Amino acid sequence: MASRIKKGDQVIVIAGKDKGKQGEIIRIDGHRVVVSNVNIVKRHTKPNPQRGISGGLIDREAPIHVSNIQILNPMTGKGDRVGFKILDDGCKLRIFRSTGEVIGA
């Protein structure tokens, strides 16, 4: 099954405390994604000299549910739904539903 979102896609948050923020997908874990500069939380870390970790409070991105994001359409500057188009040779392409443009091309 082809994924509607992929690592490296530009997305916009459509729900939650970070609604309206934009970022790039860093990691996908099942139905949750980590987006750069979105859902920043503070983590308390212990110092670990063997790994070179100084410890203290560290700001990092926490995962958010995939239903709270939409892929960003660069032509419109808004969030858009993702559709699929199957070519004659059997290749499956992701397209923007509003414009029909191929994603990532």
Swiss-Prot record:
Part of the 50S ribosomal subunit. One of its GO terms (molecular function) is structural constituent of ribosome. GO terms for cellular component: ribonucleoprotein complex; ribosome. This is Large ribosomal subunit protein uL24. Keywords: Ribonucleoprotein, Ribosomal protein, RNA-binding, rRNA-binding. Belongs to the universal ribosomal protein uL24 family. PANTHER family: MITOCHONDRIAL RIBOSOMAL PROTEIN L24 (PTHR12903). It holds the Pfam family KOW. The keyword RNA-binding applies. One of two assembly initiator proteins, it binds directly to the 5'-end of the 23S rRNA, where it nucleates assembly of the 50S subunit. One of the proteins that surrounds the polypeptide exit tunnel on the outside of the subunit. The gene is rplX. InterPro entries: KOW, Rib_uL2_dom2, Ribosomal_uL24, Ribosomal_uL24_CS, Ribosomal_uL24_KOW, Translation_prot_SH3-like_sf. HAMAP family: Ribosomal_uL24_B. GO terms for biological process: translation.
